[in-house]
């Protein structure tokens, strides 16, 4: 089998994770930590791309990586327009939306730009894979009870789809032939109904749907939320933080560290026990609801993400949902590996690269 060498780039707010893979095998994985004062000099996140590019190239050189031997560069997908899942070739339309922050400004927008900047000089393809804006929801799933307020698809697409493919392989099937309920449990929690390779429904794990998580509130009583918003006690930004960042375990028990909460549970703390069980309860309830989306025809329930390492949490969830289907646990996430595998599927011609297309009617982002 021929070897495809792939450079993978995953930018964060103050760091850039890079990996070099020979097919599925990691040759190099490194987290480059950027000096906050240095990156603070740039007015916009997007202006950091040249600085980050040079830093990446220096690190590769220091490890003896000859970039002329690369077959492709793959970056983390950013805040683009809603697109279906898959591996996309970075093109001019995508670069424009990433640079302009069409759907928002985030460090992940640098992924496609950095991939393109490095790849174009080597005359090799640049890709992104399954960004958070992956949207494969069916029309019926978009309807909410307020006109003009559509439900949105924002979830852990990269890890959910990567793990779903692994599970399909373990079951000796193609991802596109199975119905799976995939639950990513990390700082946020998302439950996706995967129908024959498409995530036809999923809770918006970013800002206000589904189970509460270590730092997100999830679905809350709407009437009480409205009263809180108009109480005069909070600014808008404070309310957003209550939903994202200071919600969930942070609000209820004062920490987003699930390990600390587990230690409290093991010591018999009644409040910690109730709250941790409540999080598992809400995850199980979301899985149960998603099973109805697939008419109960489920090949497997998959638990993944950092919290899937928690035996207490996993056992609580299993106890409530294992009557629906077998529960398969794949703890953690490996974004670099997932990106490399997405690029590799295209290089091996197992799937065709997708094209990012901007349609005339899409003058504003869904957001």
Curated annotation (Swiss-Prot):
Key word DNA repair present: no
Q: Where in the cell is it found?
A: Cytoplasm
Q: Which reaction does it catalyse?
A: butanoate + ATP = butanoyl phosphate + ADP
Q: Might you give the EC number(s) for this enzyme?
A: 2.7.2.7
PROSITE patterns linked to this entry? ACETATE_KINASE_1, ACETATE_KINASE_2
Tell me the enzyme class. transferase
Q: Which GO terms describe its molecular function?
A: acetate kinase activity; ATP binding; butyrate kinase activity
Q: What is this protein called?
A: Probable butyrate kinase
Q: Which Pfam families match?
A: Acetate_kinase
Name the InterPro entries for this protein.
Aliphatic_acid_kin_short-chain, Aliphatic_acid_kinase_CS, ATPase_NBD, Butyrate_kin
Q: Which GO terms describe its biological process?
A: acetate metabolic process
Q: Which family does the UniProt entry place this protein in?
A: Belongs to the acetokinase family.
Keyword terms, alphabetized: ATP-binding, Cytoplasm, Kinase, Nucleotide-binding, Transferase
Identify one Gene Ontology CC term for this UniProt entry.
cytoplasm
């Amino acid at each position: 089998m021929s070897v495809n060498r792939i450079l993978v780039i995953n930018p964060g707010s103050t760091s850039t994770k890079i990996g070099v893979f020979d097919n599925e095998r990691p040759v190099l994985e490194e987290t480059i930590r950027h000096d906050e004062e240095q990156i603070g000099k740039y007015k916009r996140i997007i202006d950091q791309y040249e600085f980050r590019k040079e830093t990446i190239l220096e690190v590769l050189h220091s490890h003896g990586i000859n970039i002329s031997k690369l077959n492709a560069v793959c970056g983390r997908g950013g805040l683009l327009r809603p697109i279906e899942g898959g591996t996309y070739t970075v093109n001019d339309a995508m670069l424009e939306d990433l640079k302009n922050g069409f759907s928002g400004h985030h460090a992940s927008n640098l992924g496609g730009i950095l991939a393109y900047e490095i790849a174009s000089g080597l005359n090799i393809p640049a890709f992104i894979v399954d960004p958070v804006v992956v949207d494969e929801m069916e029309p019926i799933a978009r309807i909410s009870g307020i006109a003009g307020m559509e439900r949105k698809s924002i979830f852990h697409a990269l890890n959910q789809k990567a793990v779903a493919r692994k599970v399909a392989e373990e079951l000796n099937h193609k991802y596109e032939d199975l119905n799976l309920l995939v639950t990513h449990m990390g700082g946020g929690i998302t439950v996706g109904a995967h129908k024959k390779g498409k995530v036809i429904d999923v809770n918006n794990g970013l800002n206000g749907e589904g189970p509460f998580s270590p730092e997100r509130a999830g679905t809350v009583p709407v009437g009480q939320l409205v009263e809180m918003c108009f109480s005069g006690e909070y600014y808008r930004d404070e309310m957003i933080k209550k939903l994202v960042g200071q919600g969930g375990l942070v609000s209820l028990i004062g920490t987003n560290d699930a390990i600390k909460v587990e230690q409290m549970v093991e010591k018999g703390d009644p409040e910690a026990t109730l709250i941790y069980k409540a999080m598992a309860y809400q995850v199980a309830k979301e899985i149960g609801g998603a099973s109805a989306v697939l008419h109960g025809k489920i090949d497997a329930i998959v638990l993944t993400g950092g919290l899937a390492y928690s035996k207490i949490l996993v056992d609580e969830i299993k106890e409530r949902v294992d009557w629906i289907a077998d529960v398969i646990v794949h703890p953690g996430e490996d974004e670099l590996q997932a990106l490399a595998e997405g690029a590799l599927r295209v290089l091996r011609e197992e799937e065709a690269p997708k094209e990012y297309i901007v349609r005339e009617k899409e003058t504003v982002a869904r957001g």
